[in-house]
Regions:
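Hydrolase active-site cap/lid region
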Residues: 217-311
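Gly/Ala-rich beta-loop-alpha elbow adjacent to hydrolase catalytic centers
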Residues: 207-211, 215
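Short beta-strand immediately N-terminal to the catalytic nucleophile in serine-hydrolase-like folds
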Residues: 205-207, 246-248, 325
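N-terminal membrane-anchoring alpha-helices
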Residues: 1-62, 352-353
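Alpha/beta-hydrolase
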Residues: 129, 165, 247-248, 393
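Serine-hydrolase catalytic core
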Residues: 71-72, 280, 285-417
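Intrinsically disordered, low-complexity domain-flanking/linker segments in eukaryotic proteins
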Residues: 87-123, 150-156, 224-240, 305-319, ...
Length: 417
């Protein structure tokens, strides 16, 4: 009996200690610095021991990647890669000097990579916004760039641009929601204004995980601007739509995400132990600083939500090609989060919402694959000016889905439709 009591006491104090640790973690996450460190994980940074300028170590030709620096309006320096398809590397082998020092040039506009894009009116651009942690050359990211470059043809070369947000890799600064939006808009402003002057209709934006939130925010900023006069705005007035916007493994917003997010599918969702304490859950959610409301942003982009303070009267006649792809076996951000974004974009639960389903396809045997297409024909005539495609695929997980053919086909479809 004494031994049983001793075991019960040990179990009790072990549970009490675990509970205390959990409560301490939740409370610590209400502090801005700790919260953002956990969200962005930018301190998990292989750039401390990896040289991102040595692009051969990531599987590229030295001549295939032109590193560059980009200075934001708030004076942060972002590091990026301009990646070329192999057929351009072969065709312009003499111009692309493999003996040049690794790293960004003092004047990027003097580089062959810049000239190959700037002087080709048929060239296309894919902007890739990566997820949290590490840098632009980490994990599956180089493979995803190679997949995108593989879509390039001599008639329509595809150039890929990727940056590290502020505080990531060797970029300066500290990440915040508005900070990352500034970073994304700065890159798109760089591409769409002088000296490049690339029309948005030749640009597809692809985001994965955290990058989907950046993608949605940048697209919204280009569509509507910002009511804040001090915020970054599109460099070109009333820009035309992007060729496509693709969200891979997205989430509706951060308060919703923390109810279901699991680190690598190993940990339980952070608020799951508080399911029986809704007030405490609400308190924890209310302390989230960077909410990243992708669901709200796509609803405004599709015209389902028209409550934007400074609605652009010209936007109703403009196109939107939005694709949302989520893997059924994503153990980090469950596919239902992607479905929430689809529901917000299409107004699935909004009475008298505009638009309607134009296509749906599901596995006949009740399998995981699903395709839904919604169109909002709010423009003149019968043109479908807003289109949203939802794809749930069986495989790809959270990160690898960005390297799968489904993602490549979405980019190809965006350029060709």
């Amino acid at each position: 009996m004494v031994e049983t009591n001793s075991l019960l006491k040990k179990a009790y104090w072990s549970l009490a200690a675990a509970g205390l640790v959990y409560v301490s973690i939740v409370i610590s996450l209400t502090y801005p610095a700790v919260q953002r460190l956990a969200l962005y994980a930018n301190k998990v940074n292989p750039a401390y021991w990896e040289d991102v300028n040595l692009v051969e170590s990531f599987g590229f030709l030295k001549t295939q990647v032109q590193p560059f620096n980009l200075v934001t309006p708030d004076n942060e320096t972002l590091y990026g890669w301009h990646l070329l398809p192999l057929h351009l590397c072969r065709e312009h082998e003499a111009e692309l000097d493999s003996d040049k020092p690794a790293g960004p040039e003092d004047d990027y506009t003097t580089t062959p990579a810049f000239k190959l894009l700037a002087n080709d009116p048929n060239a296309r651009v894919v902007v890739s916004f990566h997820g949290n942690a590490a840098h632009l050359g980490s994990a599956q990211r180089p493979e995803s760039y190679r997949m995108l470059l593989g879509l390039s043809t001599p008639q329509n070369p595809i150039h890929v641009f990727a940056i590290d947000y502020r505080g990531f890799g060797i970029s300066t600064g500290t990440p915040t929601e508005e900070g990352l939006i500034i970073d994304g808009v700065t890159l798109l402003n760089f591409l769409t204004s002088a000296p490049y002057n690339i029309p948005p209709s030749r640009i597809v934006i692809v985001g994965q995980s955290l990058g989907t939130a950046v993608t949605a925010a940048v697209t919204e900023r280009f569509a509507f601007g910002s009511p804040d006069p001090t915020a970054i705005q599109p460099a070109i007035k009333d820009p035309e739509p992007f060729a496509g916007v693709i969200l891979l493994a997205c989430f509706s917003n951060l308060p919703n995400l923390i109810e279901s997010y699991s680190v690598k599918g190993i940990t339980p969702p952070i608020l799951s132990p508080l399911k029986g304490y809704p007030r405490v859950q609400k308190w924890a959610r209310s302390h989230i600083l960077d909410t990243w409301d992708t669901a709200g942003r796509v609803a405004r982009l599709t015209g389902v939500n028209t409550t934007l303070e400074i609605a652009n009267p010209f936007y109703i006649e403009k196109a939107l090609d939005l694709t949302i792809i989520h893997a059924k076996n994503d153990v980090e951000i469950p596919w239902r989060e992607g479905r929430r974004v689809w529901m917000a974009a299409t107004g699935e639960r909004v009475k008298d919402a505009p638009g309607a389903l134009s296509f749906e396809k599901r596995d006949a045997n009740g399998g995981p694959n699903e395709v839904l297409i919604w169109e909002n024909k709010s423009g003149k005539g019968d043109k479908a000016v807003k289109r949203v495609r939802w794809e749930r695929v069986a495989y790809g997980g959270h990160n690898r889905v960005a390297t799968f053919s489904t993602a490549a086909l979405a980019v190809l479809r965006a350029f060709e439709e």
